[in-house]
């Protein structure tokens, strides 16, 4: 899957789950399961409930995503 195929949406972190997973509510009301991208993990960026984040979704599975940015 190339980088052009992903869908980027904004959302809000609802709750942290085990294994660095998060339940994220998207701006359109859908809830997705998202994990943290490698760059966020390498830079030790903390993600807490209530944070606004950008999530990349695959067009093949819209119920799972990757958190790629946390807004300040």
UniProtKB/Swiss-Prot annotation:
Its main location: cytoplasm. CDD domains: S1_IF1 (cd04451). PROSITE patterns: S1_IF1_TYPE (PS50832). One of its GO terms (molecular function) is translation initiation factor activity. Pfam families: eIF-1a. InterPro entries: NA-bd_OB-fold, RNA-binding_domain_S1_IF1, S1_domain, TIF_IF1. It is found in: Cytoplasm. It comes from the Bacteria. GO terms for cellular component: cytosol. Keywords: Cytoplasm, Initiation factor, Protein biosynthesis, RNA-binding, rRNA-binding. SMART domains: S1 (SM00316). Residues 1-72 form the S1-like domain. PANTHER family: TRANSLATION INITIATION FACTOR IF-1, CHLOROPLASTIC. Component of the 30S ribosomal translation pre-initiation complex which assembles on the 30S ribosome in the order IF-2 and IF-3, IF-1 and N-formylmethionyl-tRNA(fMet); mRNA recruitment can occur at any time during PIC assembly. One of the essential components for the initiation of protein synthesis. Stabilizes the binding of IF-2 and IF-3 on the 30S subunit to which N-formylmethionyl-tRNA(fMet) subsequently binds. Helps modulate mRNA selection, yielding the 30S pre-initiation complex (PIC). Upon addition of the 50S ribosomal subunit IF-1, IF-2 and IF-3 are released leaving the mature 70S translation initiation complex. Belongs to the IF-1 family. This is Translation initiation factor IF-1. It comes from Desulfitobacterium hafniense (strain Y51). The gene is infA.
